[in-house]
Amino acid sequence: MWTKALLASALLGLGLSAQDTLRLNFPADSPVAVISSNWGESRAAARGGALVVDLRTTLKLKNTSRLRLRGISLQVAVQELAAGGKASVSVPSLDVYPGQEFPVKIDLRLLQPNASAGAAVVQVQLDGVLFEDLSFFGPNRLGSRRQLIAWELEARRDRHHLKQVLAKGGEDSLRQSMLEILAQDTARPKLDVRLARAPASFPNERQIEVAFMRQTDFPVEATGGVVMASGNELRIPSLSFENRDKREVRSVELGLIIRDAEGREFSAGSLPAPLSMKPNGTGTVQPTASLQLNRGQGLPLRIESISGFVQQVEFTNGDVWVPPTSFRHEARLLKLVPGSVEEQRLSDIYRRRGMAVLLEELNKQ
């Protein structure tokens, strides 16, 4: 059975009324408890025949388990079946002790199709919680288990690397590494990537063969793929992979690098895909999404060529694999692909609070 914490507040001047409702639905045996919640600075406004809800609030939760909590994922919805009616909030890189309270910030825009209903009803459900031993609790409807574990493995990898830098070269070497991370993040070319359902074809589209980076010691290798491109849009009819591992594969995530007509390269994010592959077997996926790519200020980008690399693998036994530091630090990727959530968090700590606080943070876990 699910317990329902029903919280409502009238916020005059914020566009919300007493009829607007914020519902938090957590399982009765949830290892996370709701301490407090309200609408915060949220707003709701009718636009056409729909109700637009700008949900801006912070939930206060508590770890009621006996393990340290590493990440949490929530599903937030006003209308699950409508476009724009559902979203998710995930918070990785946590270190919440048993009994400790922690905030989860929500900043989302949701669309409730029927404004005539007269009230905004926002449902917040727990999709999953990850603990220090990589155990997971939750329905996992959004596939958050895979992503939370991947984020945690990347965090451990990057923390280990920075600790090695500190051990070998002291604070000066660590400081230099953090300055390089900050400089790379500033210099990294940015690309706006928008996903949509792939059409059967684009007008005047052309075929481009995907060039895959060599990953000889990885558990899964991308072996073939083509994209159909038209201007700044692309769709991917098929991608082929080979499983080199003894474990059965459940899903693969492919990182994409785009080169434009002027020879500039950009990271286009990653493309996760469910893919069942037996040990030492092969498989093909046919992604259903298309990508629209724009540079800064909405300027379209003309796609010239595409490179790909395996960024994540999930196995049917629950294991998740992420690339090692040596591959992450390959010059081309370092220049183009943003660092992990944990690397960004630690570099922000160094930038805002200095070396002493960074050292304290590295020694925590």
Predicted features and spans:
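Positively charged n-region of N-terminal signal peptides that target proteins for export
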Residues: 1-5
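Intrinsically disordered, low-complexity Pro/Gly/Ser/Thr-rich segments with frequent PxxP/GP/PP motifs
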Residues: 81-117, 262-301
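Beta-sandwich strand segments
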Residues: 85-86, 134-143, 265-267, 318-327
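Short coil-to-beta strand junction motifs in C2/discoidin
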Residues: 55, 69-74, 117-124, 233, ...
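Short acidic, flexible loop segments centered on an aromatic residue
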Residues: 64-83, 127-128, 244-265, 311
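Low-complexity, acidic Ser/Thr/Pro/Gly-rich terminal tails and inter-domain linkers that flank the onset
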Residues: 19-56, 64, 81, 147-238, ...
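Short, surface-exposed ligand- or partner-binding patches at beta-edge/loop junctions that are enriched
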Residues: 113-133, 295-317
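Hydrophobic h-region of N-terminal signal peptides that target proteins for export
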Residues: 6-18
